[in-house]
Every structure is written in C-alpha cells, then in structure tokens.
C-alpha cells in the first residue's frame, strides 16, 4: 500500500512545466536535470500522483526527442532510485510500452523491450507487463526466423506463478509456449507445459477457442507418442465442445476420429467402456459404416480381417488417421489389424479351453508360426492368460490351479450342486402336495 503524500506537489509541477523550455535537443539536458531534482522531492514526499506525472513527462521528453539511448538509461536509473513508489513505476512501464508500436527501427524497439524486461525482472508489481513484453520480444524473434531464441525467451517466463495475471491471458500465454516447443519438435517439454493448465478452466463458455487450441496441441503430442487412448479422449473433449456441435460437418469429422482411435486403443476395461459409450451415441447413426465396425468389436463374435479390410478399408483409408503412403497411417492400419486379431483371440478364449495352433491360425486367418508369435507377444503384455505346448502344438487358455484353488473350486461346485438338489426336492414335494390335493377334490 502506497503512503499518503506528505505534501501535494501538483501545483508546483504545473509551474515547473510552464518554466521549462520548449522540447528540443538543445534544452533536453537542462530540462531533464530540473525534472530529476523535482522527481526526487516528490518521491520523498510520497506524492504518487505527481510522481507518476513527472516520470511520464521525463519519458515523453526523451521519446519525442528520439533519444532512445537516453530513455533506456533513465529507465534503468529511475528504477534503481531509493524509495521508488510502486504505483508510479507501474504507470511508467505501462506508458513506455505504448511507444513500442510507433517505433519503426527494429533494433531500437528490441533494445527498449530488453531494457523494460531488465527493470521489471523480479518485481511482482510489474509481472504482467514483463510477461507481455516477453511475448512481444518472442514474436519478433519468431518473425525473424529465430525459433530457438523465441522459444527460450518465452518459455523461461514462469507465468503460472503470476497471481495478478488474468487467467484467460495466462492460459493463452502457456499455449503459446507449448506451440513453440512443438515447432521445435520438443514433445516432452510441450507435454510438461500443458500440465500447467487445469482443464476445468475450459468449462467456461467464453474460452472455447482456447479449449480447441489446447486440445489441438494435446492431440499432436498424443499422435507423436502413439497414445491412442489419450488421443481418443482429446477428440471426445473437442467433440463435446458447443462450437463443434453447432457445425455438422465438424462434429462428424471429429466423431470419426474418436471412433478410429478408440478402435486402435489396446483392449482393457476402459477401452471397452469407451466403445460402449461411443456406440450409445445416437449421432453415430450418421456414420453407418463406422457404427457397424464398432458393433463388430463389441459383440462376442469372430471377425475375419480380409473381410474387414474389404468392407471398411476404402472408408478408413480415406481418413488421415489411416492415410496410405504415410508412415504413421500405415502403422495405424497395421495396428488396427492387430486389434482385430486380439479381439478374435479373446473370443476364442471364451469358447475354448484348449485349441490346436493350426486351428487357431485358421480362425485368425494367420499362419501357425505367425499365430504363435502374435500370441506370445500378447501373453508377454499380460493381455490374457494362455500357455503353449509346443511339442503338441496345443494352446491352453485355462489357467492351471494349485491344490488350494482346486479344493476351493470343488467346494464351490459341491455347494452349488447341493443347492440345486435342494431346490429340486422342494419342487418335488410341492408337486406331490398339489397332486394329493387334486385327488382329494376328485373324490
């Protein structure tokens, strides 16, 4: 909190302005000397209002004269003065920032920005101004093609710690930091910086553009890492955005990507639940081919990959997710084949406790050696339990039990059997009683 002024210097400052010579290069030094002496008196008297006017007058004097070197020197000097009033210094920085759009010489502009960043470094009361100056300097470096310097300048600014920074502007700043990391293909740091943003912020209606920008960057990171489940979730978040729902063409495109990445995600409980929720969306009716494909993965029935490729191949390959002649697209197409085979193995495991390798290969449309290799990979990843007897070429999907487990299962089966016998006994007794009653009535 600023101190109350001991003396009001506003009238004296008005008199000083009248006494100063016209603003020209000859009189600048004399005028500046008078102003600096007066500024010290005002500052020591804690007259914030007049002090602010004096500081701005000094800056204007040098700016109009085109003495940018003198302006830079005075800014540094004024900030080092003992007992400077925070409100006055904040106003000075804000005022000098208004000069920047009118400076045509790029070197002069950069020097002034650097000076302002230097004097605001570590000062909480001008942290917002420093952040904006940093962003401006970064933009200049980026326009010059120096992406590395632009990224280093912008990303070294810890805006997440700036309490006085407007939250919307803060999020936009962080997203700009992430964008520069992505331009340099630094996906690890880009992912780290996105974690500084709380996604609950995007629940507000007036930040939908920032939400779309955020998830666009998250999708790029997820695609680079082949994190299909994460990418699917990001697309669902975009799909649920009001501005996307208002555009039929847009939400159809996004929903198509949601389905594609849900199918690419390796099977687990979360993926299964996600597929069922997607299938329950009535808007999926507008994509009948993908709706059929989703149902193929939900029902407990075998799918033949050659048939899947024949029916859905042209539609899927036209999507950028499975684009032909693209390394990532070809990889995802191969991954989709794996998901189909994994689904088929789970179906087989539900119906068979033991099966011959050659028979499983026929069901999966794979050679015995390829079947064995694929099965070994899935077992190693703990997708399900299976044991291969190589000499006999038999695969067992039933997990072997120890003595205790066998005893527990036997006990459970006996209990279930006795329960059923008791129910049958009761039904027989009931039937006998009904029969005896009918005979008694007949007599």
Curated annotation (Swiss-Prot):
Signal peptide positions on this chain: none
SMART domains: PINT
GO biological process: proteasome-mediated ubiquitin-dependent protein catabolic process
InterPro entries: PCI_dom, PSMD12-CSN4-like_N, PSMD12/CSN4, RPN5_C, WH-like_DNA-bd_sf, WH_DNA-bd_sf
Modified residues (Phosphoserine): 209
Record domain PCI: where: 230-402
Keywords: Nucleus, Phosphoprotein, Proteasome
Chief location category: nucleus
Claim: Nucleus is one of the keywords in the record: yes
A GO-annotated cellular component: proteasome complex
UniProt KW Nucleus keyword: yes
Family as reported in the entry's similarity comment: Belongs to the proteasome subunit p55 family.
Function field: Acts as a regulatory subunit of the 26S proteasome which is involved in the ATP-dependent degradation of ubiquitinated proteins. Required for proper proteasome assembly.
Protein name: 26S proteasome regulatory subunit rpn501
Organism of this sequence: Schizosaccharomyces pombe (strain 972 / ATCC 24843) (Fission yeast)
